[in-house]
């Protein structure tokens, strides 16, 4: 104990000096609505922090992602194993030694790494953590629909300058879990003709996207799919059973999820969690499904980052992952965004398809130095994920053509440059659109999203054994598109092909083949005189509202089955 105290005293002298740096200088602190501070945390209370160690060979990783994802490449579909990725990106021996010695001197204990060795999660007392990270001051907060308790620091932290070449950031200090939930809209007014429907169900989706009763998993492959849920969002298997009883009688399906990764709470089911599971398992019917449920349950952990760590630590994973998480780009530090983007790159190299909801605030809006601008969302803006926008039926009571759902998120990143795979499509949109917002509102050279879309308006969901109508949001369209990609993977696996992997390079090369082009409607944005609440508008081909369009399953299967 005396030796540890001397170590801490020496450490405090070193890091209290001027030789420190701020890893995340642009990380803004703001207490989100619905969260309340409960005051300082007891100095002897223990917390868990995750240290992101500097990775190697990221340029080479990017090259390999391009090679395995481009159908014109001889390496197409020859994905890396987790061990291959680890060998490529793992930190240098010097970084590993330096960080481990630093943490040991601080009294950190029970440290756990991942297979790729680029993240280290350790337990420390609050007192030790505040000495280790000058400036940090840990408080407990409560908020969210489940009154979740989390520990965060309202002040920026510093690291010793000597650690700058070795540590990208420390997670678990600033970012609050985003509150993402689908909207429940009022029932549309009016009465449709014979043949009407009263909301989106699996049978409506299967009719619109041309899925037959035969379009289900065979049960003979190792095909699998997953959704991830955060912030105490739980599903109940009894809800899934009731949902399939009501809406799944016309197609073969699985009665329960194959695996839950993380803690599945006993509280009330969340509408978003129920929506994710029910529509992933009805669109990707009869395919083994995993649920990542609120991973990282300790108060100081970031659930989204903990999900990424799970992906970095499992050698065998589902082929398709759908996620409804999102944050405003400007609310996150550039270091954090880039580090998370690298995790998406690692997943793409391994042949995983990651689909993210584009968000439910249209183009978004915020004010910078008194000037309004659109507000892009992340991870929707990552160049290594496939982002799913939202549509509505032109006639809400009929299975008709689709138009833009005005809440569908979309736009241009202020962080990521435009990837080469989409330059031609974006240039064509900017050249041909007759309803472009003023150029000062968006970064025309940034990564543009979404890439695709699906219906996002008027879903039926069963939650806590109650059928709930008119649930809406890209939280609905994302699992639907993910399930359809899982069906295509099923055919590829049966034909001896690899799974689709990172879809975007192929998607843009095929110029929307296999998709219904959505050409009518605009999404919402800033409510000012200059744009009057209108963001971007859809048009022929790709657009930043619905991407290339919505799935026409037989045509999309034909397009993506080979090679």
From Swiss-Prot:
GO MF annotations in UniProt? endopeptidase activity; lysophosphatidic acid binding; metal ion binding; peptidase activity; peptide binding; serine-type endopeptidase activity; serine-type peptidase activity; sulfatide binding
**Which key words tag this protein in UniProt?**
Autocatalytic cleavage, Calcium, Disulfide bond, Glycoprotein, Hydrolase, Lysosome, Metal-binding, Protease, Serine protease, Signal, Zymogen
SMART domains to which the protein is assigned, alphabetical: Pro-kuma_activ (SM00944)
Propeptide positions in the record are 20-195
Is Hydrolase a UniProt keyword of this protein?
yes
Describe cofactor binding as the record notes it.
Binds 1 Ca(2+) ion per subunit.
Q: Name one GO cellular component term.
A: lysosome
PTM summary: Activated by autocatalytic proteolytical processing upon acidification. N-glycosylation is required for processing and activity.
Which compartment or compartments is the protein found in?
Lysosome; Melanosome
**Signal sequence: where?**
1-19
Query: What functional role does this protein have?
Result: Lysosomal serine protease with tripeptidyl-peptidase I activity. May act as a non-specific lysosomal peptidase which generates tripeptides from the breakdown products produced by lysosomal proteinases. Requires substrates with an unsubstituted N-terminus.
This one is known as Tripeptidyl-peptidase 1
Species this protein is from: Rattus norvegicus (Rat)
